[in-house]
Regions:
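Alpha-helical scaffold segments that flank or form the walls of functional sites
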Residues: 42-46, 56-114, 141-160
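Twin-arginine (Tat) signal peptide motif
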Residues: 1-5
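Mid-to-C-terminal alpha-helical segments outside catalytic/metal-binding sites
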Residues: 7-18, 27-34, 299-342
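Histidine/acidic-residue-rich catalytic or RNA/ligand-binding cores of hydrolases
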Residues: 54-57, 101, 127-128, 206-212, ...
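Divalent metal-coordination and catalytic microenvironments
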Residues: 47, 89, 189, 247, ...
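Active-site gating/metal-coordination segments in enzymes
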Residues: 106-109, 114-195, 246, 251-255
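Short acidic/histidine-rich active-site segments
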Residues: 197, 250-251, 272-295
Length: 342
């Protein structure tokens, strides 16, 4: 089957997922300092990182970094974006890649930003480096049970609850483990209402994940295609958005932010701006590197990207991208009206 046939078949089978589902209701979102209504989010960076440890799930252990050093480096950057108008910061570092919810809570309190953390495991290929060895053979149901427990009881005894599910896949066809992780994310979504944000290298991988969600009766609106800007075929982004998935344009740097503007402008031209999320995917403290390595600031979205969007598409588009869409994506859009599991 060639690429065009694959995409056409996937789109046909996913057509029923074109909306977020019937009678959806917004619920509070868990931040590291407590639940917040989506209407209170304000300007939101939906995909950033404070700290990442690439050692691997079987090598991560306490004491690999000094939290005080991380705070010293991260806090000024958080204060900078708050001055630029940011009010909510979504940290996408998952378990076994350096997730530290107590550190996030300290930074949230010190900066005055609302910060959101996650549950889930990060797949992404055959080596499964960031999934604990003992979990690599587990069925989706047992993986989901772990993530649901974090939602219900809090993470690592902290009482801090996740506001979304983070996972990752490699190229297609998805590995058996990646497929189980996506299915586990679907099961967790059905139990908690948390949206799924998946590090996804290609449009083909995005559509394969949406097919797994469809098989579990999970709507496309419960899925964020992270790093969608890396797909060279813009029509795949269009199709994913038409199905109702969230298409995230991130990875903004000094040498590429104008291309990101063009990708967003392309989505807007097709009436799809309502399914677009944007963020810098910046930071972070690199565990194991001297001084934490090259910690990129988070401000580029506010200082360069959004001003250009304002010039090209207007203030309404800016508000949609940085306030309304993140609130809708994270805001607990439920399949059953009146569901109060949040």
């Amino acid at each position: 089957m060639n690429r065009r046939e694959f995409l056409a078949g996937s789109i046909s089978s996913l057509a029923a997922l074109a909306s977020d589902g019937p009678a959806l209701a917004a619920q509070k979102v868990h931040t590291v300092t407590g639940p917040v209504l989506p209407s209170e989010f304000g300007m939101t960076l939906i995909h950033e990182h404070i700290l990442v440890d690439f050692a691997g799930a079987d090598q991560i252990r306490p004491g690999r970094y000094d939290p005080e050093e991380v705070i010293r480096l991260a806090l000024p950057r958080l204060e900078q974006v708050k001055k630029l108008g940011c009010r909510t910061f979504v940290d996408c570092t998952p378990a076994y890649l350096g997730r530290d919810v107590r550190l996030l809570a300290r930074l949230a309190q010190a900066s005055g930003l609302r910060m959101v953390t996650n549950t889930g495991y990060y797949g992404g290929g055959q080596d499964a480096k960031f999934v604990p060895e003992e979990a690599r053979g587990l069925p989706s149901e047992k993986l989901a049970a772990r993530w649901i427990a974090e939602y219900e009881k809090g993470i690592d005894g902290s009482g801090i609850r996740p506001g979304f599910i983070k996972t990752a896949v490699g190229n297609t066809p998805l590995s058996p483990l990646d497929a189980r992780l996506v299915r586990a994310a679907a099961l967790t979504h059905k139990a908690t209402g948390l949206i799924i944000a998946s590090h996804t290298p290609t449009g083909r991988a995005a559509l394969e994940q949406l097919e797994i969600l469809r098989s579990e009766a999970v709507p496309a609106g419960a899925f964020i295609w992270v790093h969608a800007q890396n797909e060279p075929d813009s029509t795949v982004r269009h199709r994913a958005a038409e199905l109702g998935a969230w298409v995230e344009i991130d990875g903004m740097r000094e040498n590429n932010w104008e291309r990101r503007v063009g990708q967003v402008e392309d989505m807007a031209a097709r009436g799809l701006l309502g399914r677009v999320l944007v963020s810098a995917d910046a930071g972070w403290y690199h565990v194991g590197e001297p001084g934490g390595g090259d910690f990129l600031p988070y401000d580029l979205v506010f200082t360069k990207f959004l001003p250009e969007i304002r010039k090209l598409l207007g203030e309404k588009a800016v508000r949609q991208l940085i306030v309304e869409n993140p609130a809708r994506a994270l805001g607990g859009w439920r399949l059953e009206a009146g569901d109060r599991r949040r």
